[in-house]
A protein has these predicted regions:
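Conserved alpha/beta enzyme-core scaffold
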Residues: 1-208
Length: 208
């Protein structure tokens, strides 16, 4: 964001705190005349105020570690237990903003991990609070859609092509219901990665 501000791509910024690299902090100090007019630090009671966020019609963009087929997202825990990030004020923004967007690369670790999974290993934001999921593959607009339509959008538009057949296979295995899930296979991607080191090696027959 510091570079975007210096390039004129972001005009102003407001935040309760700054956590930047030493290099970015040096740029702020070296351009203090500019940043003193365009960067505002406010206490979290103001920056994360639901009333202020709603009144401004904020477009909330947050980062996810993984998203599942129905629009739930995990932004904090790896494989359900290892803490990677805190959620900060994201819940204040996604629930009160005009639009909530979660972004993530479709894969990690050279393709061995899919960010689109049958079921998240941990959930920070539920399907009720997520409007859009965006990866480098495209975006899924989840607004006003039922579970199966959301799943189709996410697979077709957000999942990496290497994982789309596996995700479609999971949907076929899941028993019918409002939100189809196969309890033994729901975390097969994660289990396979922990055992074999690559989610692409998932064989659902091992979980049936």
């Amino acid at each position: 964001v510091v570079d975007y501000m210096l390039e004129g791509k972001v005009l102003d910024a407001s935040c309760p705190a700054m956590t930047v690299t030493n290099e970015a902090l040096r740029k702020v100090y070296d351009n203090m005349d500019y940043f003193s007019k365009h960067l505002t630090l406010r206490q979290s009671e103001v920056a994360n105020s639901p009333e202020v966020i709603r009144r401004l019609g904020v477009i909330a963009m947050n980062t996810a570690l993984e998203c599942d087929l129905y629009g739930n997202e995990n932004s904090s825990h790896i494989c359900g237990s290892a803490l990677m990030n805190g959620i900060g004020g994201s819940c204040d923004y996604i629930r009160n903003g005009y639009i909530s967007i979660f972004t993530t690369p479709s894969t990690a670790k050279g393709g061995k991990i899919s960010a689109i999974v049958p079921m998240c290993s941990h959930i920070d934001s539920t399907e009720h609070d997520v409007d859009f999921i965006v990866t480098e593959q495209g975006f899924a607009d989840l607004r006003g859609k039922g579970p199966l339509r959301r799943a189709e959008e996410i697979i077709n538009n957000c999942a990496h092509p290497d994982y789309r057949p596996l995700l479609r296979e999971y949907l076929k295995l899941a028993p019918m219901g409002h939100e189809p899930q196969h309890m033994r296979a729901a975390l097969a991607f994660h289990d396979t990665f922990l055992r074999k080191g690559d989610m692409r090696l998932t064989d659902f027959s091992e979980f049936l």
